[in-house]
Amino acid sequence: MTTVGFIGSGNIGATVARLAVAAGYDVVVSNSRGPETLAGLVADLGPAARAATAAEAAEAGDVVVVSVPFKAHRDLPAEQLAGKVVLDTNNYYPQRDGHVAELDQGTTTSAELEQRHLGTARLVKVFNNIHFRHLAALARPAGAADRTALPVASDDAEAITTVTAFLDAIGYDTVEVGPLSESWRIEPGTPVYGAPYGPFDNPDGTPAAAADVRAAVAAARR
């Protein structure tokens, strides 16, 4: 894997792109407003980055990070994402996305609905439970004593392996949550959402070891 595509280049998307470039990856960024609006981000990221449309970013990426509001997930380019590992950073916020009965009733998860739309893409839920400032600040080299872990969920074991390697390269350990049906354990309002990484008003964050993240995931109640 050498190229990471980005559909959505807001706080989380841009932060992951910076970490990826620092780790030696090429990145192709996109947003809903067009490549020309990303000139500043591309300049900041440097020569390893270029801007494109969402479909082009999906086509170019060996893996693709999706970081758009949940309500926009049906606009994702399923054809270009077919068969690819997709990193889903999204959360369902009813006040922003409107109410979805299946999610309000707890009969499915936002990740499962996104997987349903994407078909053969291999979706991994990740990056949705950490503030972007903490994500930028807490990256550490492999083996660091204060390395932080992030939870991941997927129905595809090979996709988990791919994402684990990517997270390791950009500075994070991984805690496997289980299939997408268990991704509710890392959604807003659960113990692992935000809290292990420190208060939002502390931009440096607090390192959260794998054991602590695993315990927070296990403590979730639906």
PLM feature segments, named:
Residues 13, 71-74, 93, 130, ...:
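Glycine-rich nucleotide phosphate-binding loop and flanking beta-alpha elements
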Residues 46-98:
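Rossmann-like NAD(P)-binding element
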Residues 1-40, 44:
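NAD(P)+-binding Rossmann beta1-loop-alpha1 motif at the extreme N-terminus of oxidoreductases
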